[in-house]
Amino acid sequence: MIVLGITETHCATAAVLRDGAIVGCASEERFTRLKNDAGYPRLAVDALLRELSLTPRDIDLVALAGTRAYARDWMNRVLHDADYAREYYGVRLEEPARGLGRRARKLGARLGLAERSRGKFELTERQRLALVTDHLGLERSRIVAYDHHLCHAAAAYYGSPFAGERALVLTNDNAGDGL
C-alpha cells in the first residue's frame, strides 16, 4: 500500500509510505526557498513522485494531517510578517503576559461572545480537497483527514519502544483541530 501523507501548516511537508515504511519525505520550503512555507505542498509532492518513480494512480491513500487547513497566504503572513503576527496573536514580545489576549479571544469565540480570530482564513473542506484532487486527479474517496492531535499521538506512539503495546499518549499543543 502506498500512502501520501501531507501537512499544510508551517513547514508544509509531504511524505510517502510504502507498506508502512517511510520511503520519501520533502518540505515545500526546499523548493520555494521560503522558510517554513505553509499551504498545500504541491512542489514537494511533485518532487517525491518524480524521485520515487510514482504516478498519482499508484497512490492508494492521501492522509491529511488535521481536519482543518488555512489559506497559504494567511499562514505565511502570520509566519513572516512580525507586525501582523503581533496584532493577530495579541502579543508584544517585550511583554509575554499580553499573549493572554489571544487565549481570551479564543475562549470568547467558543462561547459566542466574540468573533473568531481576526484575519484567519480557513479553507472550506471543498477548497482543501480540491487542492489535492485538482493536482493529482484522485477521487475524493482516496483522501482522508486525520485529527491534528491524533497525528501527534500516533507519531509519538509508533516511534516509541511501546509500539504494539497498550500505552497512554498525552499531547499538549498550542494550536490544532479544536483549539
Where are these regions (language model features)?
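Short acidic/glycine-rich loops and adjacent helix/strand connectors
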Residues: 1-179
